[in-house]
Amino acid sequence: MKRILNVTVLAAALLVLFSGCRKESTERLAVGVTAAELEAETYSEIWDVLWRGFDQNYVGWEIEDFDWDESKETYTPKFQELDERVEAINEAETPDSEALEEVETDAAALMHEIFDRFHDGHLFIQYRDYATSQMHAFMPADTRNADREDINDAPKMEKSYYCTPDGEFGGSGEFNYISVSKIMCDLILEKLPQMEADYTRLAGLDSLDVEQEAILEALEAKLPTFRKMKSYMEKNEFYASSLYSMYKDSIGETESALLRLEYDLPTTHFDDDEIASLVIGTTGDNIIYYRLNHFYMPEYRMLELSEYDKLSAADSTVYDTYYAALNQLHDKTYKMHSEGTLKGIILDVRGNGGGMAAHLKWVAGMFYKGERYNLGTMKMKDGLGRLDYSLPSKFYMDCYGTNEEDIDEPIVILTDANSVSCSEITTISVKQHPNGISMGMRTWGGGNKLVDDARYNSILGYAGCIGEYNKTAVYVYLPYILTSYYDLGIIEGVGVAPDIEVRYDNDLYEATGRDNQFERAISYIREGK
C-alpha cells in the first residue's frame, strides 16, 4: 500500500529512535505471508515461504549480486528432491534416523548456499527441519566473518588495564565509575536461594498445574545463567562496593598497579557467558576513556523471568544509575572542554554487538551541538513489490541538545571485527567528526536499521520479521530500512575500515596486561600521529 511522502518521512524519523539489532524479536508476521503458511512442513513449503518473504520484505536488493528469480528456479527442484527422500524414509516400518539426519544436513547446506550470499549484517534465519523437526538457525554474516583472521582478536571483557604513576590511568588521574553491578548482584544473590528452593519443590511434584509448569519452565531456562553469574561474582573481588576503596587506595600511592577498570552488570539479555559493562575513566593528563559493550539501555529488560519475574522492580534504579553516569560523563567532558583542560577522548566499542539506536544519544551524541546530527540517508520498504521502496530520507542521530558547540579535541574510537550495528553507526559518527578517527580493525558490516515493534507495524505495514522466533516453522529477522552513510555508502557485508589499523596483540596482553590498541590511541592523542 502506497502512502504519501510526509507520512513515510515521519515514520523514517521515528524509526531511528526505536530501531535496533536484536535477533530475538517475536512480535509480528510479515506482510504478504500468512500465519498458515508459516506453519509450512516440507522443505518445498519452507523454501516457498522464505523466497516470497524475502521477495516482498527485503530492502537490500541493490547490494546483492545474484538473481532471486533464478534462485527460485534452481533450488525448488532440489528441495522437492529432499522432500521425496524424507517421504521414502518415513514409509519404512522403522524409519532410518541416520538417513533422516543426512537429509537434514543436506537441507542445511542448501539453506546456507542460498542465504549466505546475502550481505546484510543483521539477517537471521530459523526454520523447522522437515526430516527431524529440529530448529535450525543461522546468520549469513557469521559465515562470512568466520573467515576473518581477526574475528577472535577481541579483547577479553575481564581485562585489567595496567597503570603507572606517569602512564595510562595513573598518577593523579581521577576515576569516575558507577556500581550498577552492586544493584544487580545483590538482587541475584538475594533471590537465587528462593529460586533454587522453588525449582527443587516444583521438580519434585508428581503433577503441575499450568502456572506451576510455566514457573518450572522459566526456572529451568534461567537458573543455569544465574548460577554462572553467582560463580562469577564470587570470583570477582573487584565488583560492586569494593571498586571505590580499591581505586582510592591504589591511585598515586603505588609505583605500579594493575587496576581493573570494569563495572560489571550481569544480565540475561545476552548469552550466558556475556557480562554487560560500562567503563568510565580519566587519565592523569585528562584523556577521557569510556567503553560499553552494548546499546540496550533505552529498553533495558533486566533479568527477565517470563511469568516468574521477581526482579524487574529494580529497573528504574538501574536506569537512573546508568544514565546518571553517562550524564555525569557528558557534563565533565564539556566542563573540561570549556576550561581548556580536555586533552582528548577515547571511545571503546570493541566487542560491542550493538542494540538500540536511541542509546546513541548518550554515546556519540555527546560530541555534537544541536538536537541531532545527519549521518546519511535511508529508504524503507513501501509495498509488496520487490523494489517498492520509499523515497530516501535523511538519517539522523539524536544528540544531547544542550551542547553549544562541538567537541574540538581529538576523538579516537577503538573498533574490531565484533563491533556491530550501533557500534558501527557510532564509529561512522566519529569518523565524520572533524577531529575524530577510528582505530583498530574493520567492523562487522551491519549498519541497516531494523524494527520489530507492533506500534510501527501499524504505521508502516512491515514488521522487520517473518514469523515468530522459536514458534513458527519459519522465522526471519531482516531489515527493511537500507541506510547509506555519507563518505562510506552502504556498509552491509563490508564494515567500516579503521583510519589507523592496529591488530590486537593478545600475546602482549597475556604476558604483560598491556593493550596495544589502547596504547596506540593514547599515543595518537598525546603526539597527534
Role assignments for model-derived ranges:
Residues 1-8:
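Bacterial N-terminal signal peptides that target proteins for export
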Residues 22-353, 358, 369, 458-465, ...:
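Flexible, low-complexity junctional segments that flank or bridge functional domains
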Residues 22-51, 202-206, 226, 282-290, ...:
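C-terminal "post-core" interaction segments
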